[in-house]
Amino acid sequence: MSRGFILSDEIIDHEINSPAFEEKHNFDASGKLNDLELFTKGQPFSLYKELRENAPIYFHDPMPMDPEPGYWVLTKYEDIKYVSMNPKIFSSQYATGNMLTLGSEENRHPKLFKSTIDHMLNLDGEMHLNLRKEHMPFFKPGYVDELKQKVSLKVTELLDQIAPMGECNLVKEVSQQLPIYTLSEILGIPDEDRQKLVSWMEFLELAQYFTYEMIKEQNEGKTDSTPDPAMIDMFNAMVDEMFDYGRFILKNKRKNPSNDLLSAIANAKIEGQELSDEFLDGSWLLIIFAGNDTTRNTMSGGIKLLHDNQYQKELLINNFDLLPGFINETIRCVSPVIHMRRTSLIETEVGGQKIGPYEKIALWY
C-alpha cells in the first residue's frame, strides 16, 4: 500500500548550489542576519535599510558549521513581489518554508524536521491549489459569522478579566489566550484538551530558546556545545505527545468527520491519495504552532506599536473606522513572519542579479 506523497523524502537528498554568478553589489554589510543577537530586542531595521540601499540582492554567508551554501537576501519590495509571483521559477516545494538551511543530519529531530517540511505551504502549483481548494468549503459565510460572534465574546471575557488588574502581562493574559481559543474552535478541539495546546506551544518556544543559546555558542567557536540531556528527554516526550494527539484526532476526524477544519484536513487528498502520516503531522504542526504564533505576535506587536506611537493611538481610539488600516499596518510593521524562502529552479535574474539553478533565496519582509 502506498504511503502517500511525502515531500520531505524528496527534499532531503536535493542538493543546493553555491552561487553560479558573481554578486552585482560588491558590499560588506555591517551585520549578519544569522546573528541571533540582532533579533533579541526587535528586528534590525537599520541593517535592513543598509542592505536595501546598498545591496538589495545580497549573498549571505551560511552559519558556522552549516553544511549548506549561503543564500541570497532580498530586501526590496519589487524584487520580493517578483519572486513571490513566479512560482514556476522560484519554488516553495524545494525551499522548506522559512528554513534557511536543513542543517546537518545528526541535528535533525526525527518528527519535527519532517513535519516542518510536509505541509501545504511547501507545495507548488496544482498540488498546493488543490489542497487549498479542499479546505476552502469549510469557511462558509455562515460559519465565519458564527465564529466572529464567539471570538467577540471571548475578547470581552478576556478584557473583563484584566480590567481589575490595572496592569498585566498582555502576552500571557490576552495575546496567548485568544489565538488558542480561536484555533480550538476552528479545529474542533474539545474544551478539556485546549490547555494542552498552550503547554505544547510554551515548550516549543522554550526549545527555540535553548537552540538559540546553542547556536550562539557555536557562532562563538564553541564546537562542543550540547544541550542538557534531561531537557532533550523532556522535549522529545512532549513532541511525541503532541504528534500522537494530532494523529489520533485527525484519524478520528477521517473516520467520523464533523463541521470543523480538522475534518477537512483529515479527508483532503494529494494526487488522489489520502494525506500520509507525515503530512498529517506537518498539517497539525502548521496549524497549532504557525497559526497561533503569528496571530499572537501580531496582537502583541500591534499594542506595542500603539504604545510607542501615542498620537496614532489617540487617532485610533477616537475613530474606529481607522481599524482596518491599523491592522494592515500592524502586519506590515510587525512582520510576524520575518522571512520566507524560495529555491531557484532555473538560471534566472532578479533586480539585475543573475542567479543559477537550485540556489537559496530568502525574501526578507
Short names for language-model regions:
Residues S2-Y365:
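Cytochrome P450
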